[in-house]
Every structure is written in structure tokens, then in C-alpha cells.
Amino acid sequence: MQKEKVWDKLSTDTEERMNAANELFSDRKVVPSQNGVALLEAVIRAGDRINLEGNNQKQADFLAECLGSCDSEKINNLHMVQSAVPLPIHLDIFDKGIAKKLDFAYGGPMAAKVAEFLREGKLELGAIHTYLELFARYFMDLTPRVSLICAYEGDKDGNLYTGFNTEDTPVIAEATKFRQGIVIAQVNKLVDKVQRVDIPGEWVDAVIESPKPFYLEPLFTRDPANITDTQVLMGMMALKGIYGEYGVQRLNHGIGFFTAAIELLLPTYGNELGLKGKICKHFALNPHPTMIPAIEDGWVESIHSFGGELGMQKYCEARPDIFFIGPDGSMRSNRAYSQTAGHYATDMFIGGTLQIDKYGNSSTATASRVAGFGGAPNMGCDAKGRRHVTDSWLKCGAEFEDQAALLGDMPRGKRLVVQMQETFKEKMDPSFVEKLDAWNLAKNANLDLAPVMIYSDDLTHIVTEEGIAYLAKCRGLEERMAAIRGVAGYTEVGLSADPKETKTLRERGIVKTPEDLGIDRSRANRSMLAAKSVKDLVDCSGGLYEPPARFVNW
């Protein structure tokens, strides 16, 4: 007689694991913090796929410490799937043998350490993803068996308030719980009733009030005092030669001083150019403090945020016409939704990088740093499924002559994808190279694919201190390479430029210098910025912006 097939192995296994942890609970779903390590040892098995909530900003740091304190004889060979690995403890668990494999999106401060662990064989890399790509795999082949998340508030029934820094939590919890997994949350505070139910209690198996609030990284805060004159010049070129030229109204700004400079130029140079009301209306963007002057000056209509930003909560709550504010009066971020908006609803992505090769491929992965990509590849690409029309999208598509080779006379738009980078970085390290370091990283980490952030066929513009290369206007790869050489300065790539060829490209408007754009280099200095310090941002916000202590020097 044929044995009856069992269809509920996952839920049965989950029940067995939770039963093993029964004695650790104090009240309904509450587990005392001193039982944190024991709880993880009860519900996690060697070889499990684990999500440890490491976001851009908020970190489930207490649960990370608990995981790092587990007995590696019991808990080992874990496959970690998480957005970011910005804390030392995230790699300590690999050093201790508790974890073996990593699939992630962003390395941040641990970028150099990730590269070191790869070289030493302490860490096996699955892939470097973009955020939305990793989230998608949570619902396919990388579903966590146990997820360790964090929230501001939780109650005895497991309801969570994630609020300003909701970030990745909903997608993690849903993917895990609806595949019969286990969800454990650390909360800053246990309350009788949460301020707002962001994660329903049915999705949460255990709640731990952590000894201290979860760590928040002010990742997108840039001190205007550190913006250089060169960055101001490049910002002026971008505003006049790209934003104004294409009338970009829906966009995303990547992290860094280049885009911070642009944000602070809107109320000054942007107004001088008469661009208010014509550009920069709708953003998929974290609440950058450097956006405050532009918001106050009436440039922005809406901002949906991937995450919060430390110190910006009161300001966002006081501007409900701009930010997405709930009935309780607090903002809710959501990385999955904002990444979706960034992919389909924006007309431009603009941000920095670490290396660009002679073809225009761009990467933040170098021989010594595995920085990851975050959301850049998701927004820094042409969304082929897009079907709605905007003027800037159509204009860029009309310029993209190579598209006709595959589509014939069928019109289609194209997203503007802009990389801003000075020709040399710190220590005179060239930004333009013949071959990306990503190739060596792929070899050292046994990756099938070199980790490229933005591929050349998606890249439409490069901005350096030398000028702008309008790559979408180029006819074929050779002309694109010539345009790149024309703005690559004194790098090896730039020195191979043919002056006559560059001159022809300038005449055709494919390469534009500041002079071609009518920009006076002598005006490109910090005096053009709407705020020149963090104190200026605080004053502009009417005291609503409360910067982290590291940025307070007055």
C-alpha cells in the first residue's frame, strides 16, 4: 500500500521548534531579553536560511548579538539572507562559524571586511543583489526559515509598530510567516497598545524588549560643510545640462555629496535657471536633510521614502503634504514599495559610483571593497515593463538611436540613468579604468558574474568635473567609448582620447563642457549652496530637524 504523502512538513517542523522554546516565554508572545540566546538555540537548526534584519538604517542588533552568542556546535553553517551587513556582528557570526553563506545587497561600513572574509574563505557569497531582487527571492528560492526583525513598539500579542523606519520589515515578515517560518522581533518598548499596527501579531511568534533601542545609521545625512567646489560645479552642470534639458520631474537621488550639492543648489541656482515647477516635483527618496531648503522653498510635491533618516522624524511629521504620513501622524517608510516606485515611476536615477570602465559599465565592487549595490541597479536601469509616458522619458528615448536597431520605427522612451564621479578619487585613485576590479572580485569569490552595478547599455549620462557625456545620443559602442574618454580627464582612459574626435562630439552636443553649457567656473563654489552647514539645515527647518550628535558642532 502506497504511503500517504505528507503536505505539512514545514508547519509541523515549526510547531516542534516553537514547542522547544515554550518555557522561555513569560506572557503570551513575550520572551525576556535574558532568554534571547536560548530562544534562538531552540528554534534555529544548523544549515537554516536566516534573515537577520540589517537595513540601510535600522538594525536588529540585539538579536544579532544573541545569534553571535549561540553555541557554534549547535548552530552552524547558516545561510544568511539580509539586505545589508553594516555592523561588525554581522560578520562575527561568520568568523565564529555560526554562518557560512551570505546573500545580500549592501555592505556599507563592512565592505572591506566582506572582501577580506571572501579572500580568507570565511564567507561564501551567493550573490550581490539589488534590494527588490533580494525581496523577490524571499518569495521564491531564498525564503527565510527564521527571521529576526526589529520595531519601535510591540505588544503581548505580537503586534508591531515599525513607523518611521519600517523599511524592510513587512516583506521579511510576510515572506517568512506565510511559508510557515518563524518570526522573532526585538522592540524598543513593550506597550499595552501599539501606536499603529504595521505588522499584525499573527505574523510574529516572539517579541523581546531589547535592553537598548535598536541601532539607527544616519546613512543619507551629508554635512553641507564637506561639499567641495568641484561638487558644486558638477551639480550646476547636472541641473542645467540634464535636469533642465529633459525637464525631469520624477526621480531618485543616490547617496553622496554630489546629489547633496544638487539638492542645495535647487533654491539658488535652480531658481536662477527658472526651473522651479518644471523639475524635481516627485521623489522616491529617504528624507535627506539636504532636501529641507528645497522643500521649504516650494520645489517638492511628494516624497515616498525607502526608510527614515535619524533626526528627520519631527520634520517629516510636520510636512504631511510632502511625506507619506499615517492617520496616527507618523511617517511610514517601505523599501519594497519605494523600490517599486523607483523602478517604474521615476524618469531619472542619478548617483555616484566607484569605478567606470572604458565601455561605461559601473561598479561599486573593487578588489578591496564589496560595497554592494543597494537599490541602484533597480533604479539605475531602463524598466522594460514600463508603459506610461512622461515628456522626459520620451525625450531620452527619442535620442537613443541604438534602440531603433532592435525596434525599427516603434517609438519607446528611456529612463535617464546618470553617474556622477570625479575623474580621480582619494589618493589619486582613478575612477575611470580599462577593466573593472569587479572581474577580479568575481574570480576570487567564485562568482559566475562580475558584480556590475549599472551596465553600459542602461547608462545615459556621465558627469565629471570635465563635462557631461550624453551617451544615449551616441551611435554604437565606439562612439560611446569616445564620449567617455572625452570626460575622463587625466586618467588612463581619458588620456587615450583623440582631441579631434572629442571636438566633433562637442559640436554634436554629445560631450558638453561647463563652457559649452554656459556655466562660469568661477561661480561654482560653496557660496551657491542654500545651506552651508548642518546648523543652517536646522535653522531652515525651524528647529524641527534634530541632527545626530556626530553632526552637531555648535
Curated annotation (Swiss-Prot):
Subcellular location as annotated: Cytoplasm
Pfam families: Mal_decarbox_Al (PF16957)
Entry keyword annotation includes Chloroplast: no
Cellular component aspect of the GO annotation: cytoplasm
GO molecular function, one term: transferase activity
EC number annotated for this UniProt entry: 2.3.1.187
Keywords of this entry: Cytoplasm, Transferase
Catalytic activity: acetyl-[ACP] + malonate = malonyl-[ACP] + acetate
Enzyme class, UniProt record, top EC level: transferase
InterPro entries noted in UniProt: MadA, NagB/RpiA_transferase-like
Disulfide bond positions: none
KW Thylakoid (keyword) present: no
pH dependence: Optimum pH is 5.5.
PANTHER family: ACETATE COA-TRANSFERASE YDIF (PTHR43293), MALONATE DECARBOXYLASE ALPHA SUBUNIT (PTHR43293:SF2)
Purpose: Alpha subunit of the biotin-independent and biotin-dependent malonate decarboxylase multienzyme complex (EC 4.1.1.88 and EC 7.2.4.4, respectively). Acts as an acyl-carrier protein (ACP) transferase component. This first step in malonate decarboxylation involves the exchange of an acetyl thioester residue bound to the activated ACP subunit for a malonyl thioester residue. Has a weak activity with acetyl-CoA as substrate.
Protein name: Acetyl-S-ACP:malonate ACP transferase
Species annotation: Malonomonas rubra
Taxonomic lineage of the native organism: Bacteria, Pseudomonadati, Thermodesulfobacteriota, Desulfuromonadia, Desulfuromonadales
